[in-house]
């Protein structure tokens, strides 16, 4: 009969992997804020194309909301690059404040006021979430 052999030498030390690395929470706030910024800008652009009328109020609201929406979408896409984040967040925040002021003080039809108010509040919430979720 054959005698069983030991596979490892008795002097071989056991391999220790060390203490497990503590992982932090999954970053949710910044991506959610970024998504909200882009959604608000896209809503503003699509609303100005599809919902605003061809009257004087609808045309002027379409002009400034289309420009603001385009700037917001470009700034939102810039947040995922190596560009500095603070100026882009400032642009988005100012656009949100401006949209809320447009909705409150201009005498536009109800659907224009709703689109501007929803986009403005969405922008401010997105900027707040993005800024609170960033650690750099």
Where are these regions (language model features)?
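Membrane-helix boundary connector in multi-pass membrane proteins
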Residues: 83, 99-117, 135
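Short juxtamembrane and helix-loop transition motifs at transmembrane-helix boundaries
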Residues: 20-30, 47-58, 74-84
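Membrane-water interface at the C-terminal end of transmembrane alpha helices
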Residues: 30, 123-136
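Membrane-embedded alpha-helical segments in integral membrane proteins
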Residues: 39-54, 100-102
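Structural signature of hydrophobic alpha-helical transmembrane segments
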Residues: 57-69, 89-90, 115-120
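Membrane-helix interface "capping/anchor" motifs
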Residues: 78-90, 132-136
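Hydrophobic alpha-helical membrane segments
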Residues: 88-103
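Intrinsic N-terminal pre-sequences and regulatory tails
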Residues: 1-33
């Amino acid at each position: 009969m054959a005698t069983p052999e030991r596979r490892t030498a008795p002097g071989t030390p056991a391999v220790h992997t060390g203490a497990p690395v503590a992982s932090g929470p999954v970053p949710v706030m910044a991506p959610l804020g970024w998504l909200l910024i882009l959604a608000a800008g896209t809503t503003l652009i699509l609303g100005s194309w599809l919902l605003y009328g061809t009257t004087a109020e609808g045309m002027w609201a379409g002009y400034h909301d289309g420009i603001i929406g385009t700037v917001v979408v470009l700034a939102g896409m810039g947040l995922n690059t190596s560009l500095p984040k603070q100026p882009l967040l400032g642009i988005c925040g100012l656009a949100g404040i401006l949209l809320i002021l447009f909705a409150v003080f201009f005498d536009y039809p109800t659907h224009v006021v709703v689109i501007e108010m929803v986009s403005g509040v969405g922008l401010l919430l997105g900027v707040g979430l993005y800024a609170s979720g960033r650690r750099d």
